[in-house]
Amino acid sequence: MMKTLQTLGFIAASMMVSTTFAADFSFDRPWAGMGTGITPVGHLAWEQGLPSVSYQQDNVAGAKDKTLTLNADMLLRTGLADGLELQLGWQGPVWQQYKHAGTKKETNGLGDVSIGLKKAINLKDDRLTMALLAEAIIATGNDEFTAHDDIYSLTSAVAYEFSDLIGTSITMRYEAQNSDWAVTAVPTLDYKIAGKLSGFSEFIYRKAESQDYEYGLGTGLVYAINDRAQLDASVGVDLNGSGKSYNGGFGVSVLF
């Protein structure tokens, strides 16, 4: 009897620890920036676009040039050790429609894959958190949906929680493709709206070597089903250039 009680007590304690870890965990979807949460050891996080959408419109030779792209991007995250996780990503199946001067073309294929290691940095502050991500995007996708050359990047994220209602963060991403460099900065403001519903707003700045500056705005909503699952919806707009460019989509994230 005593042995049975000890076994049940151990199982209950394990469940309590698991629940605590799940409560402290945070997903990286859907913002352009990166969160500072790390997947607990023994758990798997699945973050899935349902789908992600982008739309570009420009004038070429006096005619409207429109491109609509849908892709079911996904990210798998699993804890390797305390404060360290492995990330495996895929841009997913992609469908694209191109319209120009009364003509229409549709293509579909597969996007690139990625692999990364994310490490939490202990700042010894209850409100201030930090994480680093070393990532490689491997150009394995079809010709229309690939970066063509591998991209290697180092990303840092620092977040500060002002209260239970509002927080802010800054993400810096440094990437190299062949001998070309690019840097991206994403300051983000996240806020609780009501109950399980929260929102975020962000500004995206990017400068690639030998390219013009790029700017964008993004905002979205996140509904926490529970500590282990959430739904999200987001929309963004690019501010550079004379054409129109929008992005957004829906997604679901689950921690197993």
What do the PLM-derived regions correspond to, one by one?
Residues 1-28:
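Cleavable N-terminal export/targeting peptides
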Residues 22-256:
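Transmembrane beta-barrel domains of Gram-negative outer membranes and organellar outer membranes
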